Amino acid sequence: MLFLHDFHVSHTTLHYNKSEESIEITVRVAIDDLEKTLQTKTSGKLNLGIQKENKLSEKYIKNYFNSHLQISLNEKKVTYKWIGKEIAKDLHDIYLFFEISDCHSDGKIESIKIENTLFLERSDKQSNIVLIEFGVQNYNINFTKDYIKESIIL
């Protein structure tokens, strides 16, 4: 007998690149979760990773993430730029790449605040795991429908 279970998770890594003075953001999520979420906000299927991919898929992804993954450095909201995407070898997940460049032009980064509501409108059971790698300091945070904001003092 087969039991189906509804489990949705995203994995996000924020890695501080000291030499570039940037924060590299990598998100891994199930293609199906991303497509179904964006399909409710757009017209038509995205068809990610196949030849018939919607030409506006990157725009839709960028807009969605800008609204649902907000990052502040030293209490100042920052914008991040789209780098690209890659389908995982298992063809189940997709990697999304973003970057915050010149992230401490105002001086030392003392705090990071994250508001993460990714895919929460799709499932109450959504779990958004975030790993922050900042030099020798690492932080793991699990965002859920009941826990969407966290501030880290570095």
Language-model features, listed with the residues they occupy:
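N-terminal soluble domains immediately following signal/targeting peptides that reside
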Residues: 5-154
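Bacterial N-terminal signal peptides
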Residues: 1-2
